[in-house]
């Protein structure tokens, strides 16, 4: 059901995400494309014969990830002429901005509307947006309003319950889908915030992974690098350069091969076959 976070430690800014799906045949793709003066990395899945970007980070360090949301009781989707499609505005945001503060300018007082969840029927969607300057928030669809939950204590975590419904509660009092993963991640990050880096991020993803976790990615935006593990095999990792548009085997492999993103993309199944 997915877990994500942004951590602003003393030395590093780190983003992390687990992508979970019970569709074991879901086709996944990594992309790095250029737009104006930016390189943009996307993690995408094939939904209804079209690749949908679940996550992205640009070379200015802006991170966006959309994952499953368990609706609050009594929730009704917005329906007004002031609505704007979530995925449309996220696409514009990652192409045009580098700071979270710029998102509100693009949104321009409009109400964001998420489509139905394509992977988990009965669930909705919510999104984490973070930048390398220490600013991050979670945006959720309210009743004729956008619900924003901002960073606290130098980090922010998103699982599958509505963050906006628990803003006044202590972290260990949340409940709902993914609450156990949220509490687990919160405890570990709090205890390791002063030395939080790539290894600590993967430890969070390992502790919050599930049987249906298909992909785990850690981003270091100040270096424009990403690290990826597949299917909870955290002994094997690849390193991605968003600037160079390359991926190379790292931990757990006999060789340290580096390859270019062909036509800007690599299919996850091909990546596995390349390094068998």
Each PLM stretch: what is its role?
Residues 80-124:
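Intrinsically disordered, low-complexity linker/loop segments enriched in Gly/Pro
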Residues 3-95, 125, 130-276:
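C-terminal, well-structured catalytic/ligand-binding subdomain of enzymes
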């Amino acid at each position: 059901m997915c877990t994500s976070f942004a951590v602003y430690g003393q030395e590093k800014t780190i983003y992390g995400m687990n992508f979970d799906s019970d569709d074991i045949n879901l086709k996944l793709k990594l992309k790095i494309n250029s737009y104006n003066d930016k390189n943009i990395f996307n993690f995408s899945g094939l939904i209804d014969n079209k690749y949908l970007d679940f996550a992205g980070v640009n070379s200015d360090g802006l991170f966006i990830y959309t994952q499953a949301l368990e609706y609050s009781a009594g929730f009704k989707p917005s329906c007004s002429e002031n609505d704007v499609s979530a995925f449309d505005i996220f696409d514009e945001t990652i192409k045009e901005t580098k700071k979270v503060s710029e998102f509100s300018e693009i949104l321009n007082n409009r109400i964001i509307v998420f489509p139905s969840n394509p992977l988990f029927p009965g669930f909705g969607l919510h999104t984490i947006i973070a930048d390398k300057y220490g600013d991050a928030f979670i945006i959720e669809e309210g009743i004729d309003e956008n619900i924003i939950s901002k960073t606290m204590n130098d980090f922010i975590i998103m699982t599958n319950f509505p963050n906006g419904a628990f803003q006044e509660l202590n972290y260990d009092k949340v409940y709902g889908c993914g609450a156990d993963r949220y509490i687990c991640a919160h405890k570990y990050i709090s205890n390791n915030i002063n030395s939080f880096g790539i290894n600590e991020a993967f430890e969070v993803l390992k502790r919050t992974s599930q049987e249906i976790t298909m992909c785990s990615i850690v981003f270091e935006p100040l270096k424009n690098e990403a690290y990826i593990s597949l299917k909870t095999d955290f002994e094997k990792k690849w390193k991605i350069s968003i600037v160079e548009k390359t991926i190379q085997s790292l931990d757990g492999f006999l060789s340290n091969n580096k390859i270019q993103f062909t036509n800007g993309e690599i299919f996850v199944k091909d990546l596995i076959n390349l390094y068998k």
